[in-house]
């Protein structure tokens, strides 16, 4: 889909969805300053999967702004657009086990194929991911780690696939995106069959985890919402609940921000410094709302397809839309 922008055309955009002549587009008004019309290319959204079919994804790599990084494909074959509930999302802290959830859980049936999310080399397969040696008590159970043949801003990218029934690859094996690497299981610390999926940067250790929802390409016609939920002073509000409602369908998503255990360790994106992400949102108009200090705050936002859309809530100032300015992560902490 193309949109022609002519000189002196005033752009009013609800959210940042692209780059125009090196200028980041945001909610702020932007003036086209070229002497000729400029065409903006947005992802096509005309393909609609039949019921029961795997929803087509945008091709990777996909980045409609200089800060987007959809570099990975789905590690499971899914039949409909689904994503985890607010429980056990990235950044959730489980008080029962005193552990931080450093990935996302994707529910599936035992024995379903698990696929490589990108090209790379298998650097671990089996029990014992944490220690790097055989350990039948490892909480990941049978796991696979891939060191990818591509990275981001000079950092090497890794993915982890946990709780497998079995691994069908071995250390040193080269894989391509979509290659089967194992099957869904219930090994390790898990209460039911699912895939635990992680994205790691730099050295591949869990100290460098990132939210996978910012790295996995969305289905056609869908986008991602990320943001910061903060108090009046600009500090993160950990484990804070809020809602997102589709104005077209009435569907409601309940979302909880990252726990303080995660934000204190700076395990969020180096640019966004987000404390929540919600993936697989159909393009369209939404109402975002939350309670703060006995007040109720809400606003309408537009989700653009194939992009990371961003919103900030700052206490009594309410919601502000558009990509954030570059900032020091320490300023968000208490």
Residue ranges, per PLM feature:
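Conserved, short, structured surface segments that act as functional micro-motifs
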Residues: 134-148, 173-222
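N-terminal Sec-pathway targeting helices
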Residues: 2-16
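Hydrophobic alpha-helical membrane-insertion segments, chiefly the h-region
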Residues: 17-28
